[in-house]
């Protein structure tokens, strides 16, 4: 009977001592210690004992979870003895772990925002385009014939008369002056190229001179549309100029931009019917 009881008690004692058997052996006490070395700090009995007790407490907690019977009281007693230090260690580990995760997530979020921010740049909103009616274009062209630059009073009057804003009137006149300048530059380029072709291009030079005179006259308060178009095949000759050999009698057409100013203004208005001009809201 005693041998059987001893045999039954032996496994119980082994189970009781099993968590403590895994503890590390004590440090060598024969080695001389210095108070400020890292090894001495780590080999202090209090520090090693605290870590060993925390390890034993974790082992006992795991054993209590998996084992239905056993020694929950001894494990709880040992865990209660070392609970402040173990709780501090767990709290510190959880705190630093949470900080690392939050820092990584914040960094990833910033990287993602910068990447998507570079790709998904908002498009610049285009300005609205004002489509003028035929009546508005006709009145603006008629006013542009004798007045290239408007005073504030004239601008207000035209805007009120045509149902436009001051900004729309200003923009239209700016674009119209720029278009007149481009037409003159294109005409000059055509004349320069005609000079290189031969004497037949001299007729266009006379037409260009008259066109420039008319544009200067309109800028000073005279008439003229300022964007007359040279018609190929019907050059304009000054009075008394010799006729080109082989050419028939040349006559100025009644709708010529150099002779009939009202007709030219009507042509200008027809050319500008479908033109849209950018105007700020």
From Swiss-Prot:
PANTHER family: TRANSCRIPTION FACTOR LBX (PTHR24336), TRANSCRIPTION FACTOR LBX1 (PTHR24336:SF9)
Disease: Central hypoventilation syndrome, congenital, 3: A form of congenital central hypoventilation syndrome, a rare disorder characterized by abnormal control of respiration in the absence of neuromuscular, lung or cardiac disease, or an identifiable brainstem lesion. CCHS3 is an autosomal recessive, neonatal form characterized by slow and shallow breathing due to a deficiency in autonomic control of respiration. Affected individuals present with respiratory insufficiency and absence of the hypercapnic reflex that stimulates breathing.
Positions with biased composition (Acidic residues): 268-281
GO cellular component: chromatin; nucleus; transcription regulator complex
DNA-binding region residue numbers: 125-184
Protein name listed in UniProt: Transcription factor LBX1
Function: Transcription factor required for the development of GABAergic interneurons in the dorsal horn of the spinal cord and migration and further development of hypaxial muscle precursor cells for limb muscles, diaphragm and hypoglossal cord.
Biased composition (Basic and acidic residues): 1-20
Polar residues composition-biased segments: 253-267
Subunit description: Interacts with SKOR1 which acts as a transcriptional corepressor.
GO biological process: anatomical structure morphogenesis; cell population proliferation; glutamatergic neuron differentiation; heart looping; muscle organ development; negative regulation of cell population proliferation; negative regulation of glutamatergic neuron differentiation; neuron fate determination
GO MF assignments: DNA-binding transcription factor activity, RNA polymerase II-specific; sequence-specific double-stranded DNA binding
Cellular compartments annotated: Nucleus
Family matches, as SUPFAM superfamilies: Homeodomain-like
């Amino acid at each position: 009977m005693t041998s059987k009881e001893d045999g039954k008690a032996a496994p119980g004692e082994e189970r009781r001592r099993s968590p403590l058997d895994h503890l590390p052996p004590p440090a060598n006490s024969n080695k001389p210690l210095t108070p400020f070395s890292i090894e001495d700090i780590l080999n202090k009995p209090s520090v090693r004992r605290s870590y060993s007790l925390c390890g034993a407490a974790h082992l006992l907690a795991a054993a209590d979870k998996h084992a239905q019977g056993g020694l929950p009281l001894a494990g709880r007693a040992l865990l209660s003895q070392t609970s402040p230090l173990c709780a501090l260690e767990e709290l510190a580990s959880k705190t630093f772990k949470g900080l690392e995760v939050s820092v990584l997530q914040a960094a990833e979020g910033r990287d993602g925002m910068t990447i998507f921010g570079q790709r998904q740049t908002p498009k610049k909103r285009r300005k609205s385009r004002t489509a003028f009616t035929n009546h508005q274009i006709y009145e603006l062209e008629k006013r542009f014939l004798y007045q290239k630059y408007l005073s504030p009073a004239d601008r207000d009057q035209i805007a009120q008369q045509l149902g436009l804003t001051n900004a729309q009137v200003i923009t239209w006149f700016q674009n119209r002056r720029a278009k007149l300048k481009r037409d003159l530059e294109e005409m000059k380029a055509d004349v320069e190229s005609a000079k290189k072709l031969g004497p037949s291009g001299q007729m266009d030079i006379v037409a260009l001179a008259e066109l420039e005179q008319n544009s200067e006259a309109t800028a000073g308060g005279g008439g003229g549309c300022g964007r007359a178009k040279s018609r190929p095949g019907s050059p304009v000759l000054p009075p008394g100029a010799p006729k080109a050999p082989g050419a028939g009698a040349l006559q100025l057409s009644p709708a010529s931009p150099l002779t009939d100013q009202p007709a030219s203004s009507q042509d200008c208005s027809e050319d500008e019917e479908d033109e849209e001009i950018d105007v700020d809201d």
